[in-house]
């Protein structure tokens, strides 16, 4: 249930500005126009495939997903050859609001659906002997809500190693 917490200072390390939003502080997300504008990372899903010594027939029921027919239909999908016991695949799923529970639920569902679409492509089209090993239990959120502070850190600040008097960590 609800709790009351008291402290002189709170440091919001939730990654989604949850504490700041709950306390009524100003937050921002995206560029104010789109959920994942260019230059920002959309949520991503990691999953791992096991390589089988024998051919693997497609595992998925048709009709639940839209079949991927060519590599061009795999945007924002990365395959690493050195996953645990096989391959590791990361796919990004843009266009959802991670601060809204209904949108976040839809994102979780779409990410898993997309995971199976990609797996089906590798099994059916590429004839890869891969089976699903395991996947991340939740989507990886990268850039959702952030605290609207007095100053926004820039790439140049990071590259220059700029220091700030009010830094939280050193």
Which residues does each PLM region occupy?
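Flavin (FAD/FMN)-binding glycine-rich loop and adjacent Rossmann-like elements that form
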Residues: 1-9, 13-170
